[in-house]
């Protein structure tokens, strides 16, 4: 019999004892007889009221214990002292002071794969006090069993210029660090947890150690030579040759998007358009443009011809200018799936804010990092039942192409120039409008593979972007709308615990 049942039995015993006293006293009158008749009704009412209150308290206790148990089981590598504090904090937060009953000590027991939590609350009675039962002890116990599954997570994080304001970048770093710490706990590595990072802005930096087999090394892609007239310079045949002509610059690791529809797909790189073309921002004119870093050989040629002219690159030296062929490649290199906690924390801390927002580019690379397909091979197969995969996408703004009122019609980004029509149009506004549908398409592609997709709009007021991100998430419950700097850490902590592959057993 549970504690509530024991208290009810005690109340019934005391009630019968009281009836016995009345029966032994034969000097009563009608009032006493009436009182005796009334007492069963009062007792029944008292038992009903206090029993209902007791079960309500038990429900409060169980809910609070569930929250605490999930928090503890979601921190597999943490110390016992930390877990005890964590459990108490979550229990307190979910057992409000307005709840009935005063909770006693929280008991935590840690097994290999099972976390057991119990607590008891003391509940003052109402009507049962008449029969000498002044309080009741109501207890609850839960077990949380960790499933022995692996976890692969990729955080696709906005590193655009707007993240540098209002403390947003630091808040994001702190939140992402919190997620890593929760999942890894005190362990420097865990065999079954692997996390990747994809910082994005106007593109993504895949790193200079990206496999050459996935890069277009010879100019085979249809977009490789679109900005230059290579036929006029026989010693230069592709963008790699052009980098070699600049003695103080080399490729920084950013790549262009593949031609449509490959820009939205995880098709392995094999040949031609499936290969990635290196980022190479051309030297532009000095007036009305963004990226002027070389003297034009013949300024009378006109905007387009001057930009295509390769002669100015031959044996060139750029010096200290911040402009050049890597202009716009401001992002830190992505981090493939790894279980190296220190590496993850270091790469998160190194992120910086610069550039415009290309959500589909970042999201597509997040998918490729978690995919079992090349160019990254760290991810396990989608149909592997022993692993859960998740992508966390955070943005602080709408998709922006970086349009311009010059002949290029935009800044140079991962999509090249708008004038080249790689977004299906040469109109700047129409090209920018294509970015939202692309984002939605990639979201669906990711979800179709069974990958869990979380989305966060960070201090975003634009309702269209909010709707886009909510639709991208696996479910509305996995979309988090515009948290403050302080709330962002709570969001990442909630996501970390949701990803802990837990089930409750009682």
Task: Specify the residue positions occupied by each region the protein language model found.
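Low-complexity, S/T/G/P-rich flexible repeat/linker segments used as non-globular hinges
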Residues: 2-5, 13, 126-166, 175-181, ...
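Acidic, polar low-complexity linker/tail segments
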Residues: 16-37, 102-104, 110-153, 163-166, ...
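Von Willebrand factor A/integrin I-like adhesion domains
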Residues: 91-99, 212, 442-506
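Divalent-cation-coordinating short motifs within acidic/hydroxyl- or histidine-rich contexts, strongest
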Residues: 77-81, 151, 160-373, 377-389, ...
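Short amphipathic secondary-structure patches
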Residues: 2-11, 52-59, 68-123, 178-211, ...
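Soluble periplasmic/extracytoplasmic beta-strand elements of cell-envelope proteins
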Residues: 71-73, 116-118, 139-145, 152-156, ...
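Alpha-helical assembly-interface signal, strongest on the long, hydrophobic N-terminal helix that forms
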Residues: 2-84, 161-164, 473
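Active-site-proximal beta-strand/loop segments in catalytic clefts of secreted hydrolases
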Residues: 120, 156-159, 198-201, 394-397, ...
């Amino acid at each position: 019999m549970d504690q509530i049942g024991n208290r009810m039995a005690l109340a019934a015993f005391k009630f019968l004892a009281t009836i016995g006293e009345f029966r032994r006293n034969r000097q009563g009158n009608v009032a006493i007889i009436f009182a005796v008749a009334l007492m069963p009704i009062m007792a029944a009412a008292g038992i009903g009221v206090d029993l209902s209150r007791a079960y309500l308290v038990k429900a409060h206790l169980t809910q609070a214990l569930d929250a605490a148990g999930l928090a503890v089981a979601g921190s597999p590598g943490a110390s016992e002292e930390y877990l005890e504090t964590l459990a108490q904090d979550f229990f307190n937060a979910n057992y409000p002071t307005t709840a009935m009953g005063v909770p006693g000590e929280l008991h935590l027991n840690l097994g290999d794969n099972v976390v057991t939590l119990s607590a008891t609350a003391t509940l003052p009675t109402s009507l049962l006090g008449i029969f000498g039962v002044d309080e009741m002890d109501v207890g609850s116990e839960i077990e949380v069993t960790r499933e022995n599954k692996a976890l692969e997570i990729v955080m696709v994080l906005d590193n655009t210029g707007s993240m540098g304001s209002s403390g947003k970048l630091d808040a994001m770093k702190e939140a992402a660090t919190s997620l890593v710490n929760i999942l890894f706990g005190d362990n420097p590595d865990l065999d079954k947890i692997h996390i990747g990072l994809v910082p994005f802005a106007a593109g993504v930096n895949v790193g200079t150690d990206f496999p050459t087999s996935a890069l277009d090394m010879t100019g085979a892609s249809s977009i490789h030579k679109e900005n230059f007239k290579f036929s006029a310079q026989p010693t230069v045949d592709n963008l790699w040759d052009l980098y070699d002509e600049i003695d103080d610059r080399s490729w920084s690791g950013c790549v262009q998007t593949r031609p449509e529809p490959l820009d939205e797909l995880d098709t392995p790189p094999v040949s031609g358009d499936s290969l990635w073309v290196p980022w190479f921002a051309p030297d532009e004119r000095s007036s009305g443009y963004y990226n002027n870093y070389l003297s034009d050989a013949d300024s009378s040629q006109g905007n387009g011809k001057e930009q295509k002219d390769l002669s100015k690159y031959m044996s060139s030296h750029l010096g200290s200018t911040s402009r050049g062929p890597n202009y716009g490649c401001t992002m830190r290199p992505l981090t493939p799936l790894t279980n190296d906690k220190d590496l993850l924390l270091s790469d998160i801390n190194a992120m910086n804010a610069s550039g415009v927002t290309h959500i589909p580019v970042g999201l597509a690379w997040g998918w490729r990092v978690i995919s079992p397909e090349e160019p990254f091979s760290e991810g396990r197969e989608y149909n592997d039942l022993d692993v859960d995969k998740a992508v966390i996408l955070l943005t602080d703004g709408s998709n922006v192409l970086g349009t311009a009122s010059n002949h290029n019609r935009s800044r140079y980004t991962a999509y090249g120039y708008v004038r080249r029509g790689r977004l299906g149009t040469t109109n700047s506004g129409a090209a920018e409008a294509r970015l939202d549908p692309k984002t939605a398409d990639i979201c669906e592609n990711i979800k179709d593979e069974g990958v869990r997709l979380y989305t966060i709009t960070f201090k975003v007021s634009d309702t269209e972007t909010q709707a886009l991100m909510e639709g991208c998430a696996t479910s509305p419950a996995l979309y988090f709308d515009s948290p403050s700097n302080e709330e962002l850490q709570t969001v990442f902590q909630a996501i970390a615990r949701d990803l802990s592959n837990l089930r409750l057993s009682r």
